[in-house]
């Protein structure tokens, strides 16, 4: 939960101060001028108690105004959305009893103000060229764009490797499904790989938020790599969850919140699928319902797939059904029945060619 809250904090803040936003342009101007600065977003009742002196500005925000006002020693107070400058050259007097891990006066004041008020507080270092964000108990230092780009590119390369391993795992699983040789161990291995890919994706999305306008190419690469991974994961969970009515979106979210060490625990994934923990469960045969494979057949609507699974229950039963039998399913005519049979045969042939033995 703590890690999730911190991730949400970072994501919300980075949207405000990402490159390309007016606030970030103003902050960068202050950083380059080496004047330092202390900026608080929001003026609530708690803020009123700690603000002393200064000038009431109440003007629309602009990067140039922020730069000029930062030349004065005091703190600048903006509206909560950062679109208006409310006060300038104010002295902030937070409660000295609030603990702070910072050493510099400006950073210490920023941390205490953030803890006391819950407002976003931005401290711009005069000498170290560092921008630090505080809100409540959270602290985040913005990194140099070049450093972030390097890390984002490294993460994309890592994602490519993990995605290739995942794709091969899904191909192998598909081949086993047609041979009716799947065990829960095979399924859990693929779910684990899906989660690793989704976690790297989340990390790259944080980099993209921090890069702002500079992250367009990274965004395009990310979409190209993992555009269908989440949907594939949902079909996989629908295939193997104990109950067909299980909310697989909720299950996927629960798996995403597992700690890395818990994700390696196969029993945690078994529990998420709705099964009880037993010692030999992993080696038991698993029979997919067929959502993932049937969705690979072009122009086959989701409702028709639901009707097929309502009728047959599992992929193995669909595979042995004749065209005439499929024709009797609600919504499936002669043409669709032929399309399903041909589609399954084509997918099976392709999977057998592509899989690694």
From Swiss-Prot:
InterPro entries: DisA, DisA_sf, DNA_integrity_DisA_N_sf, DNA_integrity_scan_DisA_link, DNA_integrity_scan_DisA_N, DNA_integrity_scanning_protein, RuvA_2-like. It comes from the Bacteria. ATP binds at residues 74, 92, 105-109. It catalyses: 2 ATP = 3',3'-c-di-AMP + 2 diphosphate. Its EC number is 2.7.7.85. Keywords: ATP-binding, DNA damage, DNA repair, DNA-binding, Magnesium, Nucleotide-binding, Nucleotidyltransferase, Transferase. Its cofactor is Mg(2+). The keyword DNA damage applies. Residues 7-145 form the DAC domain. SUPFAM superfamilies: RuvA domain 2-like (SSF47781), YojJ-like (SSF143597). The keyword Protein biosynthesis does not apply. Belongs to the DisA family. HAMAP family: DisA. Homooctamer. Participates in a DNA-damage check-point that is active prior to asymmetric division when DNA is damaged. DisA forms globular foci that rapidly scan along the chromosomes during sporulation, searching for lesions. When a lesion is present, DisA pauses at the lesion site. This triggers a cellular response that culminates in a temporary block in sporulation initiation. Also has diadenylate cyclase activity, catalyzing the condensation of 2 ATP molecules into cyclic di-AMP (c-di-AMP). c-di-AMP acts as a signaling molecule that couples DNA integrity with progression of sporulation. The rise in c-di-AMP level generated by DisA while scanning the chromosome, operates as a positive signal that advances sporulation; upon encountering a lesion, the DisA focus arrests at the damaged site and halts c-di-AMP synthesis. This is DNA integrity scanning protein DisA. It comes from Shouchella clausii (strain KSM-K16). The gene is disA.
């Amino acid at each position: 939960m703590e890690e999730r809250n911190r991730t949400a904090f970072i994501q919300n803040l980075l949207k405000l101060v990402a490159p390309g936003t007016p606030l970030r342009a103003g902050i960068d101007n202050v950083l380059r001028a080496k004047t330092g600065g202390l900026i608080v977003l929001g003026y609530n009742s708690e803020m009123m108690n700690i603000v002393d002196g200064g000038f009431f500005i109440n003007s629309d925000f602009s990067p140039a105004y922020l730069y000029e006002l930062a030349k004065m020693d005091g703190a600048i107070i903006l509206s909560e959305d950062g679109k208006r400058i409310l006060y300038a050259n104010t002295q902030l007097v937070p409660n000295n009893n609030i603990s702070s891990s910072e050493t510099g006066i400006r950073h210490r004041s920023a941390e205490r103000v953030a803890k006391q008020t819950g407002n976003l507080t931005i401290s711009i270092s005069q000498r170290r060229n560092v921008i630090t964000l505080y809100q409540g108990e959270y602290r985040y230092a913005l990194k140099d764009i070049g450093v972030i780009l390097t890390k984002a590119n490294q993460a994309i390369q890592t994602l490519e490797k993990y995605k290739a391993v995942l794709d091969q795992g899904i191909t192998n699983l598909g081949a086993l499904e047609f041979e009716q040789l799947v065990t829960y161990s095979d399924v859990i291995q693929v779910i684990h790989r899906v989660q690793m890919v989704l976690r790297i994706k989340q990390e790259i999305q944080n980099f993209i938020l921090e890069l702002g306008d500079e992250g367009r190419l990274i965004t395009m690469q990310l979409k190209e790599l993992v555009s269908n991974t989440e949907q594939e994961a949902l079909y996989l969970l629908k295939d193997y969850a104990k109950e067909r009515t299980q909310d697989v979106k909720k299950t996927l979210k629960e798996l995403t919140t597992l700690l890395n060490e818990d994700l390696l625990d196969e029993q945690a994934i078994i529990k998420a699928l709705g099964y009880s923990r037993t010692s030999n469960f992993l080696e038991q045969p698993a029979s997919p319902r067929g959502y993932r494979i049937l969705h690979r057949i072009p122009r086959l609507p989701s409702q028709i797939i639901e009707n097929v699974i309502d009728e047959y229950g599992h992929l193995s039963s669909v595979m042995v059904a004749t065209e005439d039998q499929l024709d009797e399913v609600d919504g499936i005519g002669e043409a669709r029945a032929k399309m399903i049979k041909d589609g399954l045969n084509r997918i099976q042939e392709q999977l057998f060619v592509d899989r690694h033995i």
